A protein has these predicted regions:
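Membrane-embedded alpha-helical segments that form the functional core of polytopic membrane enzymes
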Residues: 20-60, 92-96, 105-121, 154-174
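Structural signal for membrane-spanning alpha-helices in multi-pass inner-membrane proteins
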Residues: 23-30, 95-103, 118-122, 143-151, ...
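Extended hydrophobic alpha-helices typical of membrane-associated regions
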Residues: 2, 218-281
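Functional transmembrane core segments of multi-pass inner-membrane proteins
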Residues: 29-41, 110, 134-184, 197-210
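Multi-pass membrane catalytic core of lipid/isoprenoid biosynthesis enzymes
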Residues: 44-45, 62-111, 188-224, 265
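C-terminal ends of transmembrane helices
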Residues: 63, 116-129, 176, 243-252
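Small-residue-rich segments of transmembrane alpha-helices in multi-pass membrane proteins
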Residues: 17-26, 75, 134-151, 192-197, ...
Length: 281
């Protein structure tokens, strides 16, 4: 039973649950909850791709995880690298086959864009200053566009996708700040490993301010109403301001670790802002 749990842990079950719920919320925003088949297929595709990417990333991150995440299943030896690689391939295949049940545009986004981008990122772009962070953010943003394509409403998901991109980019950057020691030892050329914590904190502050201002733009231009603003301020704007003031005071690795988790929460709440606005109106 323990062995089974370690293999499940490899896939990051909490992340998978979050991605499944995100697809449900996306469907709700597009008034598509009654389209059960499309909803279930989009959930399974996103979960399969997410799980596969998590397993494959752990394979590629083995050396850095020895320092940064010593309790991960591959590092502890509870899951073999060959097995993790096989699981990743299997899940990528299952997700791709399931995508064939959806529209041509959804198939292209999943198989033609998301899948190769995830593999190229893990093999070649991880640790590349800023580009690696941007690619991860693009992959997450594509999940929202994929959902929109599946339901025939890509336009509806463009703004949520942009917000998800911004928050994910910042989270990945802050996570690199938290992992600066392990990344430096492994020779990864991340932005924080290259320029240090102080300069990285300044970049994070500027990014947080830009993302915070950008998130207000849809409300100020009348795309969304007061419900969107209220949820956005509570779950996104306030956490971003916390990052700004904390990093202005004294940037530390422990702070970065904490804020990377806060930003994961903010990404979910940001999506809920669109859901609440749609539901209340």
């Amino acid at each position: 039973m323990k062995m089974l749990w370690h293999h499940i842990e490899l896939l990051r079950p909490l992340n998978l649950l979050t991605s499944a719920l995100a697809m449900v919320v996306c469907a709700s925003i597009m008034d598509g909850l009654h389209e059960t088949k499309i909803l279930l297929v989009t959930i399974f595709v996103v979960v399969c791709y997410n799980a596969a990417a998590n397993a494959y990333n752990d394979v590629m991150d083995y050396k850095t995880d020895v320092v940064n995440r010593p309790r991960r299943p591959l590092v502890t030896g509870q899951v073999k690298i060959k097995m993790a690689r096989a699981i990743a391939i299997l899940l990528f295949v299952i997700g791709s086959v399931l995508t064939l049940e959806l529209s041509k545009s959804a198939q292209f986004i999943a198989i033609g864009l998301a899948l190769p981008t995830m593999i190229i990122y893990s093999k070649f772009l991880k640790g590349t200053p800023l580009i690696g962070n941007a690619v991860v953010a693009i992959i997450l943003g594509l999940a929202f566009i994929f959902s929109g394509a599946a339901f025939g409403q890509i336009e509806t998901m463009i703004i949520p996708s942009c917000l998800a991109f911004g928050l994910t980019f910042l989270r990945e950057f802050v996570k690199d700040m938290a992992d600066i020691e392990g990344d430096s030892k492994a020779g990864l050329n991340t932005f924080p490993a290259k320029v240090g914590l102080e300069k990285s904190a300044k970049f994070a502050i500027v990014s947080a301010l830009i993302i915070g201002a950008g998130a207000l733009f849809p409300y100020l231009n009348g795309y969304y109403d007061i419900p969107y603003l209220v949820v956005l301020v509570l779950g996104v704007e306030i956490p971003l301001l916390m990052i700004v003031f904390s990093f202005l005071k004294s940037p530390e690795i422990d702070q970065a670790k904490r804020f990377s988790e806060v930003l994961k929460f903010s990404t979910i709440v940001g999506l809920m802002a669109f859901f609440v606005d749609n539901y209340v109106r």
